């Protein structure tokens, strides 16, 4: 007998927690896992005493679902998703819904939407953020795909999502085909940027100011009462205070080689593909790559010299405020770049994205949740067509207020030999963006010189000219060089 509102396939911790979250909100869920013994274990333990149902086969699972059938896949991205879709399609009817809640590549989601539409199945690719805790008590959800599915899943998705303000859910329809997974990808890229910016602030505190863990933890706790109020700042303070079983701080014992699952890399690759200067996320990815060269760095540290270590002689409290403002200004740049990429993707794929709504989706439940995102929503509410966050009066004033501190923090760090790839690229982007004239005219002249690629004159836009720079050779454009 059909009695379940929705099914979920994939009983790793995220899947289990999403099921329990849906159960808490009054939805009857049918659980399935490829290893069916996991279903029995889940029902006997974590889901004991709940209304959660189990199934030992896909056929049994489908038979227990009310129509239109709603099925969430929470399995490893890639072939596993396609394999389950292939098995499910023969069991489903026209109008049934498959939802991929994994970290799928947005192009895969676009393909699946297209293929399943031809079969009459509604496909949704939804970003899910917030980790295991978010899944259990309120994630940020970013659904996109076939919009016909939205009325049938809206109550469930908005019911289980994190809530902010006066109970607004951190979930709304994002857009067509791959839009939900694209937005989740950019979210993850921004997360890389936020984490690296915090690391650079920590590095300046530790190696320029010489602060101890208690002092650094206190600084981050204070910062969490300012514009920087966020989940990542909050946990950084906790990490800095945490002591191991021997009573010593744990952080210095952790190997300084950062891992990555690839979603930050996807964001950087997309930025290159669509010609958007998302420099900060790119540098955050490369910083992790550099950190992974631990053995090489140990050897290099014995051979390569930097500036002499001179104790900081300035006002520590004042420089700490410079670091805070540098972090805030750089964070603004990171989000401005992220939303530039979203805007370009919307143009490329014909998506209608609600940028203020996206900021609200990220306002709670996810790893980058922060008060700051409310300001981004306000900016897009004031001007839905806003070209760049930096052009909004609030963010323009915020960066201006931070600018002197930003430059001082970076110049002091450079003089001390501290690597700050994200602080420095953020400032370089800001300076580049505010320059009406950049030296790219020389690049165009060079390209024309060696490859006859032509150039435009400021006085004659739209007319492409080739100059015979050496007096030798013809004036025909060449395709021999593509620099």
From Swiss-Prot:
GO terms for cellular component: cytoplasm. The active site is at 184 (proton acceptor), 191 (proton donor). PROSITE patterns: 6PGD. GO terms for biological process: D-gluconate metabolic process; pentose-phosphate shunt. It catalyses: 6-phospho-D-gluconate + NADP(+) = D-ribulose 5-phosphate + CO2 + NADPH. Pathway: Carbohydrate degradation; pentose phosphate pathway; D-ribulose 5-phosphate from D-glucose 6-phosphate (oxidative stage): step 3/3. Disulfide bonds: none annotated. Substrate binds at residues 103, 129, 131, 187-188, 192, 261, 288, 447, 453. The modification Phosphoserine is found at residues 57, 129. It is an enzyme of class 1 (oxidoreductase). Signal peptide: none annotated. It is found in: Cytoplasm. The modification N6-acetyllysine is found at residue 38. This is 6-phosphogluconate dehydrogenase, decarboxylating. The lineage of its organism: Eukaryota, Metazoa, Chordata, Craniata, Vertebrata. The gene is PGD.
């Amino acid at each position: 007998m059909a009695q379940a509102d929705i099914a979920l396939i994939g009983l790793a911790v995220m899947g289990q927690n999403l099921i329990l979250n849906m159960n808490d909100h009054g939805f009857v869920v049918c659980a399935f896992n490829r290893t069916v013994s996991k279903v029995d274990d889940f029902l006997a333990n974590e889901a004991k005493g709940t209304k959660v149902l189990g199934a030992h086969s896909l056929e049994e699972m489908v038979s227990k679902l009310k129509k239109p059938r709603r099925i969430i896949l929470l399995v490893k991205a890639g072939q596993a998703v396609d394999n389950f879709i292939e098995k499910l399609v023969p069991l489903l009817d026209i109008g049934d819904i498959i939802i991929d809640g994994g970290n799928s590549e947005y192009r895969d989601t676009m393909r699946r939407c297209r293929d399943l539409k031809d079969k009459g199945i509604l496909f949704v690719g939804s970003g899910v953020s917030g980790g295991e805790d978010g899944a259990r008590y309120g994630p940020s959800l970013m659904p996109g795909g076939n919009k016909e599915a939205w009325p049938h899943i809206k109550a469930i998705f908005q019911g289980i999502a994190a809530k902010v303000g006066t109970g607004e859910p951190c979930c709304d329809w994002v857009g067509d085909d791959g839009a939900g997974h694209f937005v989740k990808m950019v979210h993850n890229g921004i997360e890389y940027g936020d984490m690296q910016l915090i690391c650079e602030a920590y590095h300046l505190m530790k190696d320029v100011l010489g602060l101890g863990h208690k002092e650094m933890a206190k600084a981050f706790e204070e910062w969490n009462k300012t514009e920087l109020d966020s989940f990542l700042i909050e946990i950084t303070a906790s990490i800095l205070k945490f002591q191991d079983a021997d009573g010593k701080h744990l952080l210095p014992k952790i190997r300084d080689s950062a891992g990555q699952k690839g979603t930050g890399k996807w964001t950087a690759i997309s930025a290159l593909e669509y010609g958007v200067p998302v420099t900060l996320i790119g540098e955050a990815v490369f910083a992790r790559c550099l950190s992974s060269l631990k053995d090489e760095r140990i050897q290099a540290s014995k051979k390569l010299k930097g500036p002499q270590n001179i104790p900081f002689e300035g006002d520590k409290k004042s420089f700490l405020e410079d670091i805070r403002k540098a972090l805030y200004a750089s964070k603004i740049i990171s989000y401005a770049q992220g939303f530039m990429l979203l805007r370009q993707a919307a143009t490329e794929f014909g998506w209608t994205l609600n940028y203020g709504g996206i900021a609200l989706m990220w306002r709670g439940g996810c790893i980058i949740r922060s008060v700051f995102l409310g300001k981004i929503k306000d900016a897009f509410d004031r001007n839905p067509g806003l070209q760049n966050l930096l052009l909004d009066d609030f963010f323009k004033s915020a960066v201006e207020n931070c600018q002197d501190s930003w430059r001082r923090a970076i110049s002091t760090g450079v003089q001390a030999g501290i690597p700050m790839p994200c602080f420095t690229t953020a400032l370089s982007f800001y300076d580049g963006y505010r320059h009406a004239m950049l030296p790219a005219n020389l690049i165009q002249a060079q390209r024309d010189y060696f490859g006859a690629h032509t150039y435009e004159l400021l006085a004659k836009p739209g007319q492409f000219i080739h100059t015979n720079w050496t007096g030798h050779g013809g004036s025909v454009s060449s395709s021999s060089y593509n620099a």
